[in-house]
């Protein structure tokens, strides 16, 4: 079906003007893609679908770009169904490739955060303290509260790495500063203390 999501999201962001924007959407995107007239332009599983989906992801990311803003995008977690998993991989691939060219986008690795020991889908996950928690509801898709918290905590950690309270964020697209490890649109590194002329000598 057709819905101009990129335009709507851009409008909402322009009105709300968030500095940190967290999104986890797209779980139902593996369907026919249509134009405004309802005409099918791409079907799932075809090369054309990947091209069109990438174009729409690009539109979303570009529409949400703004100075002093970072977009934290959660990749779709793996699912139990092999058929649907292929769609998840296809969607995440296009998102990863788009984000690689857009330094104002930080990806949260939903598949890795909810994976089992083999790195794939898991009904249960083991926490660092050894405690095992249920990760999925019976449909093999939706996350439980416990697993949602894992993803949320990881997202908050990424936000904390990007911003320090009270600091001003750099403009979107600012190159990585190797002196402080901050990425684009994150806070600038602390300025070096001014030099005291009285402390200098002529030898």
Predicted ranges, named:
Residues 1, 11, 42-51, 61, ...:
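Second-shell loop/turn segments in exported
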Residues 13-17, 66, 100-101, 150:
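Extracellular/periplasmic catalytic domains that process cell-envelope and extracellular macromolecules
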Residues 79-193, 197:
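Catalytic His-Asp segment of secreted/periplasmic serine-dependent ester chemistry enzymes
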Residues 19-25, 70-75, 106-109, 142:
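Structural recognition of the beta-strand scaffold that forms the well-ordered cores
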Residues 24-30, 34, 58-92:
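Active-site segments of SGNH/GDSL-like serine hydrolases
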Residues 1-52, 186, 190-203:
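Conserved SGNH/GDSL esterase-like catalytic core that processes O-acyl groups on lipids
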Residues 11-12, 59-63, 97-98, 158:
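A generic secondary-structure signal
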Residues 4, 8, 20, 45-48, ...:
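Extracytoplasmic/secreted proteins, especially bacterial periplasmic and envelope-associated proteins
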